[in-house]
Design a protein with these regions (language model features):
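Catalytic PLP-binding core of fold-type I/II PLP enzymes
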Residues: 1-23
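Short coil/turn connectors at secondary-structure junctions
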Residues: 3-6, 26-28, 42-45, 168
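General beta-strand structural signal in soluble alpha/beta enzymes
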Residues: 8-12, 31-34, 41, 172-174
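Short, solvent-exposed amphipathic alpha-helical segments in soluble enzyme
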Residues: 24-25, 49-50, 163-167
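Conserved active-site segment immediately N-terminal to the catalytic lysine
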Residues: 24-36
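Conserved hydrophobic/aromatic beta-strand scaffold that supports enzyme active sites
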Residues: 30, 45-49, 146-148
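Active-site C-terminal subdomain of aminotransferase-like
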Residues: 36-125
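Conserved C-terminal alpha-helix-loop-beta "cap" of PLP-dependent enzymes
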Residues: 129, 133-180
Length: 180
């Protein structure tokens, strides 16, 4: 990736707050997430982080961004605080929620959070094995906080998910795209 001048972008929507992410050590140029997963916040914010290399690419851009909504060059000026640049009204209640969620993670301890996610994953895996259900993703690529289960032939995933919700108050999302 790097030898071709490309930026290394990482999707952390599911994992931020549940895994030990080492942006600098792993030479990640940009990562993005959502607050509604491992950060345990209401949905509505998208935490992002950029390396110096990514910020330089943004500032060196020679063409105008065609869309106001994701004009990162304008947003980075907003972040700097050097000049007033109106981009959006900050959702202050969401920021308070994110602050509290980060405080909760620090209070529990990052290693404890990571271990908790792994323990729950292993417990789920043990129970799935007893039911003869298999996880879709190979062990070496799995995230402990994201478990995709292969629905056995002849079973209807919607019926299974509806029953889990109705009888056990467990809500499970369906697959997306060809995996739906």
């Amino acid at each position: 990736v790097k030898e071709n001048g490309a930026l290394y972008l990482v999707d952390c929507v599911t994992s931020l707050g549940g895994l030990n992410l080492r942006m600098d050590e792993w030479h990640i140029d940009a990562l993005y997430s959502g607050t509604q997963k491992c950060l345990s916040c209401p949905p509505g914010l998208s935490p992002v982080s950029f390396s110096k290399n990514a910020l330089k690419k943004l500032s060196d851009r020679s063409t105008k961004v065609p869309n106001w909504y994701l004009d990162l060059s304008m947003i980075t000026k907003y972040w700097s605080g050097n000049s007033r640049a109106y981009h959006h009204t900050a959702p202050i209640n969401m920021l308070y929620g994110l602050y509290q969620a980060c405080f909760n993670i620090m209070d529990e301890g990052m290693n404890n959070v990571i271990n908790r996610h792994m323990e729950m994953h292993l417990e789920l895996k043990k129970e799935l094995d007893q039911l003869n259900l298999k996880l879709f993703v190979a062990k070496e690529y799995r995230l402990p906080m994201l478990n995709s289960i292969i629905i056995p032939e002849g079973k209807n995933d919607l019926e299974i998910r509806s029953r889990l919700l109705k009888e056990f108050n467990i809500e499970i999302g369906g697959g997306l795209g060809p995996l739906a």
